[in-house]
Amino acid sequence: MFDMGFLELMLIGVVALLVLGPERLPTAARTVGLWVGKIKRTVSGMQREISAQLEAEELRQKLNEQQRKLDAGLGKVRDEVERHGDAPSSRGGQPPPSRTTPTAARSADDTDETPPSTAASRETPEPPAAPSAKDSNAP
């Protein structure tokens, strides 16, 4: 960080011992260590924020570039459509014929959305009830 060697650190330690004395030197060293840690955390936080902002700016630039390409392609398509004119108006104002797919042309009777009670009655007809002994007027 400060590019200091061992001799510079030793000189700072000796000066601090002479100025502060042996009783206050450990407390001062602890305080200096805490401040250095806070400064390092602050600097690393700033570096992370700056790199995140740079990445976001790069993404914005890429997004703008892609948007310009899309706009250019859309402009070409619009020019082609305008150059060929209105196709439906040249046919007498009638809309183009619609095409139906086999799944879209299925009738309502063929769908699976029929209630179960009606679907069951449609699939298997019930046989007529056999006459019982109570219903018959036999002598």
Curated annotation (Swiss-Prot):
Domain of life (superkingdom): Bacteria
GO biological process, one term: protein transport by the Tat complex
Role noted for this protein: Part of the twin-arginine translocation (Tat) system that transports large folded proteins containing a characteristic twin-arginine motif in their signal peptide across membranes. Together with TatC, TatB is part of a receptor directly interacting with Tat signal peptides. TatB may form an oligomeric binding site that transiently accommodates folded Tat precursor proteins before their translocation.
Region of interest (Disordered), ranges: 66-139
Pfam families, per database record: TatA_B_E (PF02416)
Entry keyword set: Cell inner membrane, Cell membrane, Membrane, Protein transport, Translocation, Transmembrane, Transmembrane helix, Transport
Name of the gene this protein is made from: tatB
Name used for this protein in its record: Sec-independent protein translocase protein TatB
